[in-house]
């Protein structure tokens, strides 16, 4: 028996009958993509939120960035927090998914290079290795490639199929890698 989502009206203005409206089929992969998007998107959102409201706030985040060799640390702290919050929310909602994924990839590549690469691969190593941030980048790229699924804003507005597959993979990779390389080239000046 088909599940019913709502009751609609059918007929003319003079004669209308209430009829059941079947639910659209939701595949297990759509539910899995929703869970992945929410987990990683909300997680990234809270990283950005913490940069603003946690511990030392933006000033503390800026000092931390300066200690790693980032130029204009106050600006970098604001940009990182804003990007984490906005891309996290967009990714969780499945809105502009490959663009949000590109922002996530860029953030994670910069974090991997600046904060984690000297600590090895594993996150449990002292100073935390680059395993975790690389995993986030790979998940973001995979979701951009697969598409956000039916349970997404992109699907609801009819653009999900336009941006998945190679197009989604390309958008996310170019934005992420290009953004990370640009930021590192312009802003990263480690002590020698």
Task: Provide a role label for each language-model segment.
Residues 62-72:
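Perimembrane loop-to-helix junctions flanking transmembrane segments
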């Amino acid at each position: 028996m088909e599940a019913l989502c709502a009751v609609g009206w059918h007929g003319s203005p003079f004669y209308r009958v209430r009829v059941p409206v079947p639910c659209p089929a939701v595949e297990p992969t759509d539910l899995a993509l929703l869970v992945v998007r929410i987990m990683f998107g909300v997680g990234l959102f809270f990283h950005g939120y913490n940069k603003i409201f946690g511990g030392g706030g933006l000033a503390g985040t800026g000092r931390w960035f300066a200690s790693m060799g980032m130029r204009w640390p106050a600006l970098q702290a604001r940009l990182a927090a804003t990007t984490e919050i906005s891309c996290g929310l967009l990714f969780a909602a499945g809105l502009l998914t490959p663009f949000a994924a590109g922002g996530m990839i860029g953030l994670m590549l910069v974090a991997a290079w600046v904060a984690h690469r000297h600590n090895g691969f594993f996150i449990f190593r002292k100073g935390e290795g680059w395993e975790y941030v690389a995993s986030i980048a790979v998940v973001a790229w995979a979701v951009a490639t697969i598409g956000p699924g039916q349970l997404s804003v992109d699907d609801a507005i009819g653009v999900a199929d336009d941006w998945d597959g190679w197009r989604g993979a390309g958008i996310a990779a170019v934005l992420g890698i290009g953004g990370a390389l640009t930021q590192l080239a312009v802003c990263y000046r480690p002590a020698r």
